[in-house]
């Protein structure tokens, strides 16, 4: 160093390593001391010295110089271990995907950082003269991050969207990468290549637009005479000192600064480093500085408002083109930094948090009232303290006190024993970082097909009551219960045992409203019973509560299922909207011969309402007559005979998107028509061999393996991912007149009628159906289709149905036979292959006479009674007209309905006691109750019905396990209301009316072990489904529009020990959800998670399920109980994370701020704030002042916040740009106002954009108010709204700009640079500026007071002084980057 100076004697010798930043500091100090020329001489000597030394050392770099860090192996192993534990937690549903991602990123980031810190000490100890170490740590070439990738580990990378990939690259480049790691690490390289191409042009265009806005801004004066300033308060906790210094250095003071009475700085003095240090030491009041914002010149800027020139540190020269410098300074980092796309991780919020560790072993104590439980952002349980918390740790000999700051997490429980150095609390990082936080949505997709359940109530999104977007109010689990929509028409196996209760959805019958009361039948008069006997060997029935209100998302008034049924009764026609209801169907096995003669193969089904209550005129039983059964698909039509009768008599109504015919007139339907058609439903991928609107013959090949059964016209339609191919048989006719087609479309024509509209007149023998077809290109034609007529016969005589005796007891009970059509008028009916369609159903309608006052009730109770004779069971239907004496209303928390068992009631009160004695009932236990019901598939077009029954008889046997029997007896004594959860049977089975238990031993019981074997049932099963119950014991009624199929391999059978029964009810309850590895039995943990759906005496059936954790504020998609297929979105989490570090993500932000676009939903809506300010100020201050001050205040506010926004982007990239550059740009895009009213039509047009100062000056000159409001222009708009049309035309939209300028007769004063360049004149900057200095000599000599004698001017100044406090407050805090606290809605996106 001695070489540097001549006078060596008084030199100070500093023995210190100098890196890049130190060199920068040295150079700036040298310039300050010695000036430019001497400094360059010194630096030349330093350069020569450096090169000489480097040559002498002759460093070379070989692959052996890359030394890996020895501790890496166990660090990676440790991280792997943590990750495995995390995986397990996620699998068991303890943490959700976002928490898992966050934590795994943090684990790997910490590992990577630790390796990076080890790197330098490792080199220093092992090989201090290692070339890699010397190069990178001296700052000559390469940085710590690059060396870390060479010898540590590459760590976490981000994908092209800037999201982290949670699979880290564990190898470093010295060891070599595996294939996966190589592909992941190529993301960065590819991104670099793409960015270089794409983003460079973006940055260039940004620079061009910026320069365009400010190209005319030149320093043209020394002082504009402004008295305004922007105040900066001295550094406090909020604003780092560094930023305070950067803000002040090089500015000019706008006011005198006093300490006490002593003035330490004068107005218009420029601020150097010495003055700033004095400000910091004295902690003065806010300092008022001049900025480009405060300059009063309209289209240029003065020296004092600009301040020092950054190049030489003196006041800026006159004629300097500061606008262009500003535009380029903002655009340049963009072009440079696009090439810098290294991701070094650090993508989670706030870095790793600080930890508080226990000072010694001992018991920890704190006040539990001051903390409340919460989850950390990794999903771990913790306590959050809102104020300072004092924690004491008592060890044997000493008590430690630790204070934990507010907003920290306490990770241990009260009175817990902690070890020394154990982490007891986590302090949230309170330091302010310049990271961009953005809100990210993370979608979680379901892994398997199944049915969705959740274990808490959810909120609906307020705008859409019926939408499937629900917000979670608290942390809960979502379960996907296995099972999917059916693929085939036969279920592989049944888990129901013989004689389980069946529950069937039947869609096309009419039902009244859901009733909420559940009654226990009590009857005073035993003689009044109706026994309705027949050879039932089917089901036991009882009043079953209607669970439909537990379907928490049931939309009562928004039912989209309409199945109109026509009840042919007393010539009345009803349109019965089908509600979602369940029904019990019992098939009769006909034993008497004469009934077999009547209906050889049809079965009668009895239905009992869910709650056991019949209304008047309700349907008791029905049977399907074979003569109304059809094999193929088709359409039904009915109505009075006549040419246009059908269109006249019915109105087409739209209901929930389904077109229905609503009859207006009451007609008696005595015949209806069936128009057959052949329908094939094929997947989208099938190739079809026939064309739409073509005509084919019988047995034509349609697809590879299907042939048509009839000939006719082919229609092909695509509906929700399926192809619907219909073949209409019939003749084709070409009509004479076009307009008559549409009138005759879709009508029935009786036989013998001649139609003149067709070219060939012809009489038809049978009924025909006329339908017009519109092909794509050819002419229209009409299709005449054959029709099948069905007459509806009169009711069947009742005597054939029932034995004589019961009906002869006169008890005002009537049974009437009614036929009704199952399908609506004009509704297409789709037949599934191999099944038949029933067109007409015959029903028994139950009615009773109201004449008898004693029994004139609106409803009646029905229940099934079983009588056992010689070990055979007979079922009777008992209809009970007397109102019950006790009826319970169900509570919401008691979904099972109240069930009464009473010891002290007489035998007369309960009809069942006449059949079984009380002791007998107590002894019997029902082993299995079960429900099966059917559903429609989603398209609501095909129907399926299950009736599970078996014709074998059973014996009744006593129950042999005494232990269990005692438990039941005890519980009956203790609590007469036995809840469903502890009872046996499949999930969702309801209790009996008189809650008696009995065992049924069937002769051919399905063995549980051979669970794939299915008894030969007479019906083919289509869909199998259960009631499902959630964790709260609420049974919910599933949606009939969906269907689900159990895969037998998804059900896990769990066998219980025999001696296990007594404790079973406490451990396993029906409907309970299990997580994986929960112990159910003594044999060890259960291996899969699931829900218990069947509890039997010796075994439990568990339906496998997958749990997903969701936290509050997450959005759940889909309805409760909806069937989701694999890959459907389940939940959306919204979480915050900081942006990954590269400017390419920052550049678009800068552009959006400068173009004043709203960034997205979380945007800083500056424009809205501007409007708000405008309105409020005008209201407060009245018209003339309001406009002026409103515009001023608004502009000041928005300017400062814009500057902060832009600075934030660049600072987060570590790029230093002086504020004044940004200020010049922002000044241009905020300096225009919009003329709002045409009060001043002779000066400005409404909607015209003018400069704020021009508006003020015009207002002063005309002495009347101009109405205007502040407006924010983007940089593109600002470039197209300048004073020079030549400059605008050279930027964009040349023809439009020039045409407009010509029409308006605009004059261009050629004040800017660009106009002069275009026209080849002298540019008015630098040396060219000197020729322009003309009129300002005597202008500057006029004293300030005479200039300001205008009254308006003085008052305006006063007002601005009054409001200065407000500015000071807003502005000072704003410069400290707290705009988000001040202005709501300014979230950083």
Swiss-Prot record:
Co-factor note (free text): Binds 1 Zn(2+) ion per subunit.
GO CC, one annotated term: chloroplast
Cofactor list: Zn(2+)
Keywords: Chloroplast, DNA-directed RNA polymerase, Metal-binding, Nucleotidyltransferase, Plastid, Transcription, Transferase, Zinc
Subcellular location per the Swiss-Prot or TrEMBL entry: Plastid, Chloroplast
EC number(s) on file: 2.7.7.6
GO BP terms in the entry: DNA-templated transcription
Pfam families reported for this sequence: RNA_pol_Rpb1_4 (PF05000), RNA_pol_Rpb1_5 (PF04998)
Enzyme class: transferase
Molecular function per GO: DNA binding; DNA-directed RNA polymerase activity; zinc ion binding
Family from the record: Belongs to the RNA polymerase beta' chain family. RpoC2 subfamily.
Protein name: DNA-directed RNA polymerase subunit beta''
Organism: Morus indica (Mulberry)
Organism phylogeny: Eukaryota, Viridiplantae, Streptophyta, Embryophyta, Tracheophyta
């Amino acid at each position: 160093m001695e070489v540097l100076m001549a006078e060596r004697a008084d030199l100070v010798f500093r023995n210190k390593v100098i890196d890049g930043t130190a060199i920068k500091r040295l150079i700036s100090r040298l310039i300050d001391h010695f000036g430019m020329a001497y400094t360059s001489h010194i630096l030349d000597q330093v350069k020569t010295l450096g090169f000489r030394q480097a040559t002498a050392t002759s460093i070379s770099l070989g692959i052996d110089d890359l030394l890996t860090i020895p501790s890496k192996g166990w660090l990676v192993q440790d991280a792997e271990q943590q990750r495995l534990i995390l995986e397990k937690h996620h699998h068991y549903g303890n943490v959700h995907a976002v928490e898992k991602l966050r934590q795994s990123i943090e684990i790997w980031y910490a590992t990577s950082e630790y390796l990076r810190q080890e790197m330098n000490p490792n080199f220093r100890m092992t090989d201090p003269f290692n070339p890699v170490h010397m190069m990178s740590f001296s700052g000559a070439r390469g940085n710590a991050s690059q060396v870390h990738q060479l010898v540590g580990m590459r760590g976490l990378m981000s994908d092209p969207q800037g999201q982290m990939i949670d699979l880290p690259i564990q190898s470093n480049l010295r060891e070599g990468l595996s294939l996966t790691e190589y592909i992941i690490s190529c993301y960065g390289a590819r991104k670099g290549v793409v960015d270089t191409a794409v983003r460079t042009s973006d940055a260039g265009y940004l620079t061009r637009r910026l320069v365009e806005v400010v190209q005319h801004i030149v320093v043209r004066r020394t002082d504009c005479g402004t008295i305004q300033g922007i105040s900066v308060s001295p550094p406090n906790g909020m604003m780092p000192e560094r930023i305070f210094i950067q803000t002040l250095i090089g500015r000019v003071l706008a006011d005198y600064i006093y300490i006490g009475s002593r003035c330490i700085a004068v107005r218009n003095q420029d601020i150097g480093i010495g003055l700033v240090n004095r400000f910091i030491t004295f902690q003065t009041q806010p300092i008022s500085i001049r900025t480009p914002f405060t300059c009063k010149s309209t289209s240029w800027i003065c020296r004092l408002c600009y301040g020092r020139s950054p190049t030489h540190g003196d006041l800026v020269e006159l004629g300097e083109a500061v606008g262009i410098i500003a535009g380029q300074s903002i655009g340049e980092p963009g072009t440079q930094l696009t090439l810098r796309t290294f991701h070094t991780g650090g993508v989670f919020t706030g870095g790793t948090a600080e930890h508080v560790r226990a000072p010694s072993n001992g018991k920890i104590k704190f006040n539990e009232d001051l903390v409340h439980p919460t989850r950390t952002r990794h999903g771990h349980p913790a306590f959050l303290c809102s104020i300072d918390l004092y924690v004491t740790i008592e060890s044997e000999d000493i008590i430690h006190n630790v204070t934990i700051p507010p907003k920290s997490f306490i990770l241990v429980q009260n009175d817990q024993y902690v070890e020394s150095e154990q982490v007891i609390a986590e302090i949230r990082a309170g330091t302010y970082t310049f990271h961009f936080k953005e809100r990210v949505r993370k979608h979680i997709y379901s892994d398997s097909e199944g049915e969705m359940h959740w274990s808490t109530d959810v909120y609906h999104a307020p705008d859409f009551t019926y939408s499937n977007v629900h917000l979670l109010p608290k942390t809960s689990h979502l379960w996907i219960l296995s099972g999917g929509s059916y693929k085939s028409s036969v279920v592989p196996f049944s888990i129901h045992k013989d004689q389980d209760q069946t529950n069937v959805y039947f869609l096309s019958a009419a039902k009244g409203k859901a009733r909420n009361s559940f009654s226990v039948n009590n009857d005073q008069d035993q003689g009044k019973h109706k026994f309705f006997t027949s050879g039932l060997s089917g089901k036991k029935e009882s009043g079953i509560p209607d669970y439909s209100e537990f379907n928490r998302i049931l939309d009562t008034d928004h039912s989209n299922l309409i199945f109109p049924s026509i009840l042919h009764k007393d010539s009345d026609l009803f349109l019965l909207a089908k509600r979602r209801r369940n029904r019990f169907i019992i098939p009769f096995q006909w034993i008497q011969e004469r009934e077999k003669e009547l209906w050889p193969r049809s079965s009668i089904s009895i239905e009992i309402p869910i709650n056991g209550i019949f209304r008047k005129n309700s349907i008791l039983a029905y049977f399907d007559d074979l003569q109304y059964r059809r094999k193929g698909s088709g359409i039904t039509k009915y109505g009075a005979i006549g040419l246009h009768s059908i269109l006249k008599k019915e109105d087409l109504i739209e209901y929930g998107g389904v077109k229905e015919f609503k009859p207006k007139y009451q007609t008696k339907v005595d015949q209806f028509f069936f128009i057959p058609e052949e329908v094939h439903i094929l997947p989208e991928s099938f190739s079809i061999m026939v064309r739409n609107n073509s005509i084919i013959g019988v047995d034509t090949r349609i697809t590879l393996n299907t042939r048509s059964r009839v000939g006719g016209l082919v229609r092909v339609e695509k509906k929700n991912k399926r192809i619907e191919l219909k073949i209409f048989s019939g003749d084709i006719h070409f009509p004479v007149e076009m307009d008559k087609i549409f009138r005759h479309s879709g009508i029935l024509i009786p036989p013998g009628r001649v139609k003149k509209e067709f070219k060939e007149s012809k009489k038809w023998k049978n009924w025909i159906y006329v339908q017009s077809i519109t092909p794509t290109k050819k002419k229209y034609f009409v299709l005449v289709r054959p029709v099948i007529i069905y007459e509806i016969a009169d009711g069947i005589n009742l005597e054939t149905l029932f034995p004589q005796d019961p009906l002869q007891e006169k008890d005002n009970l009537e049974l009437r036979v009614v036929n009704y059509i199952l399908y609506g008028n004009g509704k297409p009916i789709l037949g599934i292959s191999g099944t038949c369609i029933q067109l007409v159903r015959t029903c028994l309608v139950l009615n009773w006479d109201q004449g008898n006052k004693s029994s004139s009730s609106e409803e009646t109770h029905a229940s099934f009674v079983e009588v056992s004779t010689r070990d055979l069971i007979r079922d009777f239907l008992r209809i009970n007209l007397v109102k019950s004496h006790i009826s319970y209303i169900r509570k919401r928390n008691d979904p099972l309905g109240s069930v009464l068992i009473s010891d002290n009631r007489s035998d007369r009160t309960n009809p069942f006691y006449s059949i079984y004695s009380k002791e007998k009932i107590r002894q019997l236990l029902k082993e299995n109750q079960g429900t099966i019901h059917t559903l429609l598939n989603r398209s609501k077009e095909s129907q399926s019905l299950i009736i599970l029954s078996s014709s074998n008889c059973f014996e009744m046997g006593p129950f042999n396990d005494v232990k269990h029997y005692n438990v039941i007896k005890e519980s009956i004594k203790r609590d007469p209301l036995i809840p469903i959860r502890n009872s046996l049977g499949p999930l969702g089975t309801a209790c009996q009316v008189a809650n008696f238990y009995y065992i049924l031993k069937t002769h051919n019981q399905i063995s549980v072990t051979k669970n794939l074997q299915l008894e030969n049932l007479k019906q083919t099963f289509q869909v199998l489904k259960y009631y499902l119950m959630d964790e709260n014991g609420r049974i919910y009624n599933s949606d009939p529009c969906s269907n689900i199929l159990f895969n037998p391999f998804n059900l896990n059978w769990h066998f219980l020990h025999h001696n296990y029964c007594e404790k079973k009810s406490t451990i396993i309850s029906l409907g309970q959800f299990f997580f994986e590895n929960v112990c159910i039995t003594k044999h060890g943990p259960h291996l899969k998670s699931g829900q218990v759906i069947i509890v039997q005496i010796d075994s439990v059936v568990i339906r496998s399920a997958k749990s997903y954790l969701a936290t509050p504020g997450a959005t759940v998609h889909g309805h409760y109980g909806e069937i989701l297929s694999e890959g459907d979105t389940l939940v959306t989490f919204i979480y915050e994370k900081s942006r990954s570090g590269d400017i390419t993500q920052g550049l678009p932000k800068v552009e959006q701020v400068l173009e004043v676009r709203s960034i997205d939903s979380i945007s800083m809506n500056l424009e809205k704030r501007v409007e708000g300010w405008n309105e409020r100020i005008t209201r407060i201050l009245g018209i003339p002042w309001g406009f002026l001050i409103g515009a001023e205040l608004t502009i000041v506010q928005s300017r400062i916040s814009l500057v902060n926004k832009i600075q934030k982007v660049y600072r987060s990239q570590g790029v230093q740009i002086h504020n004044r550059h940004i200020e010049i740009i922002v000044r241009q895009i905020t300096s225009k106002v919009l003329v709002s009213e045409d009060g001043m039509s002779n000066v400005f047009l409404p909607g015209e954009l003018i400069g704020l100062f021009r508006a003020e000056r015009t207002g002063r000159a005309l002495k009347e108010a101009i109405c205007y409001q502040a407006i924010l222009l983007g940089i593109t708009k600002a470039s197209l709204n300048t004073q020079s049309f030549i400059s605008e035309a050279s930027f964009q939209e040349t023809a439009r700009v020039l045409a407009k300028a010509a029409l308006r007769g605009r004059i261009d004063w050629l004040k800017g640079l660009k106009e002069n360049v275009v026209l080849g004149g002298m540019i008015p900057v630098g040396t060219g500026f000197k020729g322009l200095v003309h009129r300002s000599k005597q202008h500057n000599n006029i004293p300030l007071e005479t200039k300001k004698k205008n009254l308006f001017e003085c008052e305006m100044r006063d007002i601005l002084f009054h409001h200065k406090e407000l500015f000071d407050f807003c502005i000072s805090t704003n410069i400290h980057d707290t705009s988000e606290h001040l202005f709501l809605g300014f979230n950083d996106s």
